[in-house]
Regions:
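Short, solvent-exposed loop/turn segments that connect beta-strands within catalytic domains
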Residues: 29-33
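Short beta-strand element of the alpha/beta-hydrolase
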Residues: 46-53
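Typically the conserved alpha-helix immediately C-terminal to a functionally engaged Cys/Sec
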Residues: 64-68
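Active-site glycine-rich loops that stabilize anionic/oxyanionic intermediates
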Residues: 54-57, 123
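Flexible "cap/lid" subdomain of the alpha/beta-hydrolase fold that forms the substrate-access gate
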Residues: 1-26, 36-41, 48, 61, ...
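Catalytic histidine-centered segment of alpha/beta-hydrolase-like enzymes
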Residues: 278-287, 291
């Protein structure tokens, strides 16, 4: 499998993400070894908080949340998914599948984290992170979800999603930072936009970003739709603290929190929040507020 590595020089102008990358060699039965990056801050002996990004971002998305969590005494870990950030980027679209992303993330998680973990996830961070919670519930002491879901293909996708999926495949130049800007309520400055473009020096680096939209299960007979149904059966038994914090300005996932609140027993009695002026990339719009909510959630439910 041919893999690209974004040169470190691509990241040199980023001044607001001071965390050095740490690399983990992970394997699967098809690709052999592949390298996944993550970033750490806060006391390493603190309670671990795992922050998983989605499409088409990288751990830089969490730069507003990480210092707040670290100052609260948590061991903060934010990975770059394969195909994103400083992680390796397989060249062929065929090298990416939902199942393989789960395998990659699970291998990395088993190596890079220890003890009980609180998960925060958004977008594809939920499609992947919640599969880990379902498969390894003993490793997770709590979960906060924002602007995400775990689709089973049993509902017709929206016209907006169908257009987005088609766009992701047909557009000649995949406009990473423009996609992010169009899904926030705040205006991002040039340095921030450049930081989101940094992992992708040219189109050959973007196979993973182009693939995520078509890996979302949109029909009931999709293999990963069945895997997600099985994951939901396990989440229906998850009775540890589970809270939702969705944005009020994200048309993609609006109302999705109700599914979690209805089906996951750990949601009962939790202080669920709708975040004002929170677009799809809510970490950009309301990062500090989200981080403070996450601190309160952990302190009130998991560290008593």
């Amino acid at each position: 499998m041919q893999v690209l590595k974004t040169p470190e020089s691509a990241f040199i102008k980023i001044t607001d993400f001071p965390y050095p990358p740490r690399f983990t060699e992970i394997t699967d039965t098809v690709s052999g070894e592949i390298r996944m990056a993550h970033y750490q801050c806060g006391p390493k002996d603190g309670h671990t908080v795992l922050l998983i990004h989605g499409e088409p971002t990288w751990a830089y998305l969490y730069r507003k949340m990480m210092p707040v969590l670290a100052d609260a005494g948590f061991n903060v870990i934010a990975p770059d998914l394969i195909g994103f950030g400083r992680s390796d980027k397989p060249v062929r679209k065929e090298d990416y599948s939902y199942a393989r992303h789960v395998i990659w993330l699970k291998d990395w998680f088993s190596q890079a984290t220890k003890g009980p973990v609180t998960l925060f996830c958004q977008d594809w961070g939920g499609l992947l992170g919640l599969r880990l919670v379902a498969d390894m519930p003993e490793r997770f002491s709590g979960v906060m979800v924002s602007n995400t879901g775990l689709p089973t293909g049993d509902h017709v996708p929206s016209d907006a999603f169908i257009k987005w999926r088609r766009f992701s495949q047909d557009v000649a130049v995949f406009p990473t930072s423009t996609i992010i800007q169009n899904a926030t309520t705040t205006v991002l400055d040039e340095a921030t936009l450049a930081a989101y473009d940094a992992p992708f020096p040219d189109e050959s680096f973007k196979a993973g970003a182009r693939m995520f939209p078509i890996l979302v299960p949109t029909s009931p007979d999709n293999a990963e739709a069945q895997a997600n149904r099985q994951a939901w059966e396990k989440l229906k038994q998850y009775n540890k603290p589970f809270v939702t914090a969705f944005g009020d300005s994200d048309p993609v996932t609006k109302g999705g929190e109700k599914v979690f609140q209805k089906l996951v027993p750990g949601c009962n009695g939790m202080a669920h929040t709708q975040i004002e002026n929170g677009g799809h990339f809510i970490q950009e719009d309301q990062g500090e507020r989200l981080a403070n909510l996450l601190v309160q959630f952990i302190q009130n439910t998991q560290l008593k």
